[in-house]
From Swiss-Prot:
Binding-site list for NAD(+): 157, 270, 418
The protein's name: NAD-dependent malic enzyme
Active site, UniProt feature: 104, 175
Taxonomic placement: Bacteria, Pseudomonadati, Pseudomonadota, Gammaproteobacteria, Enterobacterales
HAMAP family assigned: NAD_malic_enz
GO biological process, alphabetically ordered: malate metabolic process
InterPro entries noted in UniProt: Aminoacid_DH-like_N_sf, Malic_enzyme_CS, Malic_N_dom, Malic_N_dom_sf, Malic_NAD-bd, Malic_OxRdtase, NAD(P)-bd_dom_sf, NAD_malic_enz_proteobac
Gene Ontology cellular-component annotations: cytosol
Cofactor, how bound (note): Divalent metal cations. Prefers magnesium or manganese.
SMART domains: malic (SM01274), Malic_M (SM00919)
Originating organism: Shigella flexneri
SUPFAM superfamilies recorded: Aminoacid dehydrogenase-like, N-terminal domain (SSF53223), NAD(P)-binding Rossmann-fold domains (SSF51735)
Family statement: Belongs to the malic enzymes family.
Length: 565
């Protein structure tokens, strides 16, 4: 449902002159009216012409097109964001297809690697282990009092790039940009945070420009005590905030999620957001290929926290579709670098133990090896769906894809690893190896594939289709927790907007131009489920929709009135 157009009320602010021009959330630049220029001591500080935001956005678009590399475009957009946030979001929303890969994946990966080199202006909060005893003071220094969404990272597992130390701050900044651009959450309500606990990246430690704490990463009790201090300080400062964990290492991601998801409204996008968008994609792809997800056999390459999180949510969804838990688990096969996860495999991680196959059930498999490779698994399972979350390029070989297609006329193949350089196989190859029959969704953006004069659009299985709507739904409903059922309702709603399902052609996921509409629909479904689950106060459907509309921020300038501090 589109939000009703409502007249924006005037905003009363105490700032004036150069201070106002340096305030990104309030700066209008050349769009300040003549009356505002007189009232806020801006006469002579700006060119004569008063422009509209669209005129400003057109100039910015022309300037943007003058940059030749993606990282230079990223730097330019970040500069606008740090100068005039309203203009930044108007520009991004005008060109979302072009700019989303620049402000987030894959370009944000390079921005994280070069964070200290391209650093220009502070954004967000940097909390180093050295300052752990000043946690409350640090959060009190945040000028925005009504923070509603925090994205926090410790920089240890940035995309597929590993430990980027303080450079990981690029991820919370980019993620929150999408909360606003796609989910309509006001930038005034968002806060990016990096927990600087050191780095084990020797290249960063040797870099004279590196801006983080030059120390090996703290671990074990020291690490968990530090994170706990942060969580308690956040609860004290903003008790109703939504906290998103982002790009934590596998060894910490699941323990932190399990420890805090029932203590503070929180979720891990790498685990739960990735799972939700993947399940939504699979529901739609299964319907397009014929049948339900519960009828499909699924093989994973990659059994880390993200892969296992997706697998568990698939199992939950197939149970909703009528399978028993035992039957649902028998349809999911997890392969890591040591082969298929079985009950005879040593040193399994806690979250892997429920996803093993019983070795005794594999006695009739066609294989000569004790280690069951991906090819062995594909040959014997004959899967309908192949999902890659390995972070390693090229592992979906031609032999594996052709073997899958031999037994599955309409295979669903999802190489989800980020960034583009880590993808398990390119869509071009997958389409060619399956004679144009595969349904493909990727983690990074890819151009449409042309094969034998036919165009195949490639859906990006982008978490941005999920987490902004979840955030908006949590804020609008006042949810105190994010439950598994809320995430599954987001997946089901996303699947309902699949052009391939609705029209029989096109992308398996919605186009980016529709992402705000999808986010609002997900917000409603999430808010409604939160009420049903008892983690939000029950209201009428009309009241929930009104709350979503009221909280949906638009990139428009408001009229300013002068007031004293």
């Amino acid at each position: 449902m589109e939000p009703k157009t409502k007249k924006q009320r005037s905003l009363y602010i105490p700032y004036a002159g150069p201070v106002l021009l340096e305030f990104p959330l309030l700066n209008k630049g050349s769009a300040f009216s003549m009356e505002e220029r007189r009232n806020f001591n801006l006469l002579g500080l700006l060119p004569e012409v008063v422009e509209t935001i669209e005129e400003q956005a057109e100039r910015a678009w022309i300037q943007y097109q003058g940059f030749k590399t993606e990282i230079d475009k990223h730097i330019y957009l970040r500069n606008i964001q740090d100068t005039n946030e309203t203009l930044f979001y108007r520009l991004v929303n005008n060109h979302l297809d072009e700019m989303m890969p620049v402000i987030y994946t894959p370009t944000v990966g390079a921005a994280c690697e070069r964070f200290s080199e391209i650093y220009r202006r502070s954004r967000g909060v940097f909390i180093s282990y050295q300052n752990r005893h000043n946690m409350d003071d640090i959060l009190q220094n945040v000028p925005n009092h009504n923070i509603k969404v925090i994205v926090v990272t410790d920089g240890e597992r940035i995309l597929g790039l590993g430990d980027q130390g303080i450079g990981g701050m690029g991820i919370p900044i980019g993620k929150l940009s999408l909360y606003t651009a796609c989910g309509g959450i006001s930038p005034a309500y968002t806060l990016p945070v990096v927990l600087d606990v050191g780095t084990n990246n020797q290249q960063l430690l040797n870099d004279p420009l590196y801006m983080g704490w030059r120390n090996p990463r703290i671990t074990d009790d020291e690490y968990y005590e530090f994170v706990d201090e942060f969580i308690q300080a956040v609860k004290q400062r903003w008790p109703d905030v939504l906290l998103q964990f982002e790009d934590f290492a596998q060894k910490n991601a699941m323990p932190l999620l399990n420890r805090y998801r029932n203590e503070i409204c929180s979720f891990n996008d790498d685990i739960q957001g990735t799972a939700a968008v993947t399940v939504g994609t699979l529901i739609a792809a299964s319907r397009a290929a014929g049948g339900q997800l519960s009828e499909k056999k699924i093989v994973f390459l990659g059994a880390g926290s993200a892969g296992c999180g997706i697998a568990e949510m698939i199992i939950a969804q197939t149970q909703r579709e009528g399978l028993s838990e035992e039957a649902a688990r028998q349809k999911v096969f997890m392969v890591d670098r040591f082969g298929l996860l079985t009950d005879k495999m040593p040193n399994l991680l806690p979250f892997q133990t429920k996803l093993v196959q019983k070795r005794e059930n594999l006695s009739d498999w066609d294989t000569d090896s004790d280690v069951l490779s991906l090819l062995d698994v594909v040959r014997n399972v004959k899967p309908d769906i192949l999902i890659g979350v390995s972070g390693q390029t090229g592992l979906f070989t031609e032999e594996i894809i052709r073997e899958m297609h031999k037994h599955c006329p309409r295979p669903i193949v999802m190489p989800l690893s980020n960034p583009t350089s880590r993808v398990e196989a390119t869509p071009q190859d997958i389409i060619a190896w399956t004679e144009g029959n595969a349904l493909v969704a990727t983690g990074s953006p890819f151009n449409p594939v042309v094969w034998k004069d036919k165009i195949y659009p490639i859906a990006q299985c982008n978490n941005a289709f999920i987490f902004p709507g979840i955030g908006l739904g949590v804020i609008a409903s006042g949810a105190s927790r994010i439950t598994d059922e809320m995430l599954m309702s987001a997946s089901e709603t996303l699947a309902q907007y699949s052009p391939l399902v609705l029209n029989g052609e096109g992308l398996v996921l919605p186009e980016l131009k529709d992402i705000q509409k999808v986010s609002r629909a997900i917000a409603f479904a999430v808010g409604k489920m939160a009420q049903q689950q008892g983690v939000a106060v029950k209201t009428s459907a009309e009241a929930l929709q009104q709350a979503i509309d009221d909280n949906f921020w638009q990139a428009e300038y408001r009229d300013y009135r002068r007031t004293s501090i």
